[in-house]
Amino acid sequence: MKRTYQPKKRQRKKEHGFVKRMRTTSGRRILKRRRLKGRKRLTA
């Protein structure tokens, strides 16, 4: 059986990227929370 995590840069960006987060209201909320928390990296 293969492992569940098969990393792909494009897929990762498409699912968890900055642009995707900015598109939705909930995504913007996530970014806002991460900024407040002081995260060095906001998205993948």
Swiss-Prot record:
Biased composition (Basic residues): 1-23, 29-44
Annotated Gene Ontology cellular component terms: ribonucleoprotein complex; ribosome
Ranges where the record places region Disordered: 1-44
PANTHER family in alphabetical order: LARGE RIBOSOMAL SUBUNIT PROTEIN BL34M (PTHR14503:SF4), MITOCHONDRIAL RIBOSOMAL PROTEIN 34 FAMILY MEMBER (PTHR14503)
Family from the record: Belongs to the bacterial ribosomal protein bL34 family.
Protein name: Large ribosomal subunit protein bL34
Keywords attached to this entry: Ribonucleoprotein, Ribosomal protein
UniProt xrefs under Pfam families: Ribosomal_L34
A molecular function (GO) term: structural constituent of ribosome
InterPro entries reported for this sequence: Ribosomal_bL34 (IPR000271), Ribosomal_bL34_CS (IPR020939)
GO biological process, one term: translation
Organism of derivation: Alkaliphilus metalliredigens (strain QYMF)
